[in-house]
């Protein structure tokens, strides 16, 4: 295995581990509470609010397409395999930013697919709000997917210019 492949594998493993360990910690803590919808942690800073409150999501982003679980699972696995094939089989080196964005996307997808395999749903637990408005609850895998998508789109629209010698 080349050093590039090894570092790619280690990066994906680290990001997936971060996602799974945080979800497991929330689930273990949740197991000790009798409340059906607990807030495990809450911090407010003025009108901004941060909460750790577990929710379970059977669909895609924000619970979309929950009725199509098997189709979504197939799509997720296909995307993961496609990204892994690109990262490990492509001989030509892509830009470091594109490579990093794909590592983040793959890590987030693996994290959420792991939830579906082990728990039959995705474990979301991070909630951010302002006044009475709350963003849908999410997890670290969602952060990795969102950040990877933003970096990928940015590099597509604003590629690094080659220096002319």
Curated annotation (Swiss-Prot):
Pathway the protein acts in: Protein modification; lipoprotein biosynthesis (signal peptide cleavage)
Subcellular location: Cell inner membrane
Reactions accelerated catalytically: Release of signal peptides from bacterial membrane prolipoproteins. Hydrolyzes -Xaa-Yaa-Zaa-|-(S,diacylglyceryl)Cys-, in which Xaa is hydrophobic (preferably Leu), and Yaa (Ala or Ser) and Zaa (Gly or Ala) have small, neutral side chains
Active site (catalytic residues): 124, 142
Residues in the signal sequence: none
UniProt keyword terms in alphabetical order: Aspartyl protease, Cell inner membrane, Cell membrane, Hydrolase, Membrane, Protease, Transmembrane, Transmembrane helix
Transmembrane segments: 9-29, 69-89, 98-118, 133-153
GO cellular component, one term: plasma membrane
Pfam families named in the record: Peptidase_A8
EC numbers for this chain: 3.4.23.36
One GO biological process term: proteolysis
Membrane topology: Multi-pass membrane protein
UniProt-recorded name of the protein: Lipoprotein signal peptidase
HAMAP family given in the database record: LspA
Enzyme class: hydrolase
């Amino acid at each position: 295995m080349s050093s590039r492949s090894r570092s790619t594998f280690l990066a994906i493993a680290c990001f997936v581990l971060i996602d799974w360990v945080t979800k497991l910690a929330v689930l273990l803590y949740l197991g000790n509470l009798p409340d059906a919808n607990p807030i495990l942690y809450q911090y407010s800073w003025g009108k901004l609010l941060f909460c750790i409150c577990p929710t379970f999501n059977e669909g895609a982003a924000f619970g979309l397409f929950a009725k199509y679980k098997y189709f979504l699972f197939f799509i997720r696995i296909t995307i993961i395999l496609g990204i892994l094939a690109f990262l490990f089989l492509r001989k030509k080196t892509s830009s470091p930013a594109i490579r990093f964005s794909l590592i983040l996307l793959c890590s987030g997808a693996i994290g959420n697919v792991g939830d579906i395999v082990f728990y039959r749903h995705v474990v979301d637990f991070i909630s951010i709000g302002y006044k009475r408005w709350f963003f849908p609850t999410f997890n670290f895998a969602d952060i990795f997917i969102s950040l990877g998508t933003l970096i990928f789109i940015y590099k597509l629209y604003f590629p690094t210019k080659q220096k002319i010698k």
